[in-house]
Amino acid sequence: MRASITWYDLLSALPDATSEDIQQAYDAKAGLLRPELLSGAPSRVITVAARAQGILDAAWRVLCDPVSRQRYDEAAGLWDSGGGLVRPGDYPAESGLPDSDYAADNPGAEVLRGLGALNVWLDRHSDYQRRIPVPDVRGLFYDVFLGVVGRLDLQVTFVQLTEHPMPVDGLVVDQSPEAPTKIHRRGELTVQVWHPPGRATGDSPAAPYTRPPLT
């Protein structure tokens, strides 16, 4: 079955990652959304950054707690009955969480729902000549986005929004065509990507970030 996008993918973490690895993956991405890095950014970037933070928080909520993580891993079929990691090609098409685990306004759940539905559609329509619905990729970091489109065989055109970008992972803030427009397999998807601006004296990566408690 076609590999699905998981909560782990949204954090750029592996299913066998330790709790410390999960925390570090979250902190690395959330650190790029700090207010001082967003200062002066266009309003649409601020809006999408809030969506991105919601996606990260949703993934963190599921994976930071051992009980919820185990329940998710089992529901998503990431581990076999013997406790071994399932091969990527055997991942289920669905997202792995029942609807009751999703808040209606949860952006992370919204992303997984959309990508999970697309995976199901692709499993049923494998003909490369068919048109596929474009997923909503706004709020994904660029490395996560590449993982998504790599599974869809879409051709990507990258538009850099920051004149002197900091050498860190960028944030997808807009796309063309918009979701859920249908395009041909191997069709072109254009994304606009924002990076924090580099310092005038030289680009510098973001400072370490520690996640505050969620309320």
Where are the regions a protein language model picked out?
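BRCT (BRCA1 C-terminal) domain core and associated BRCT-interaction motifs
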Residues: 156-183
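Extracytoplasmic
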Residues: 129, 172, 186-188
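Amphipathic N-proximal alpha-helical interface segments
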Residues: 178-203
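Sec-exported extracytoplasmic/periplasmic mature domains
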Residues: 27, 31-35, 61-68, 150, ...
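N-terminal J-domain/J-like co-chaperone modules of DnaJ/Hsp40 proteins
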Residues: 1-46, 55, 121, 131
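Glycine-rich loop/hinge motif
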Residues: 121-162, 200-215
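Post-J-domain flank of DnaJ/Hsp40 co-chaperones
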Residues: 8-9, 59-62, 70-125
